[in-house]
């Protein structure tokens, strides 16, 4: 309880992240300090990073390995709906890959 809210995700990444893991950061502005710090920690540990972002992508646009940005609207609810669609598509693709025999 002695840590700032800006560190809430960063501390988890530092404790649990391993090279080869994937961190997905979600921020409608791309400027959420707690997500930025988590991405910075992930990058320092060699994790792959994906950003579900909005607008211009903010500060996270240049920090994540794969920025996925909903830039067609400035409205937070629409950005979040775009993020939800992205998550569903990503999960669907992962399921397809896992079901395919090697």
Where are these regions (language model features)?
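Glycine-rich phosphate-binding loops that contact phosphosugars or nucleotide phosphates
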Residues: 1-100
């Amino acid at each position: 309880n002695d840590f700032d809210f800006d560190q809430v995700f960063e501390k988890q990444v530092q404790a649990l992240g391993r090279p080869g893991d994937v961190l997905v950061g979600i921020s409608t502005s791309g400027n959420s300090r707690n997500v930025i710090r988590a991405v910075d920690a992930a990058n320092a540990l060699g994790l792959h990073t994906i950003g579900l972002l909005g607008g211009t992508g903010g500060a996270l646009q240049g920090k994540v390995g794969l920025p996925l940005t909903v830039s067609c609207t400035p409205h937070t609810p629409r950005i979040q709906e775009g993020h939800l669609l992205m998550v569903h598509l990503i999960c669907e693709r992962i399921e397809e890959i896992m079901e395919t025999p090697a």
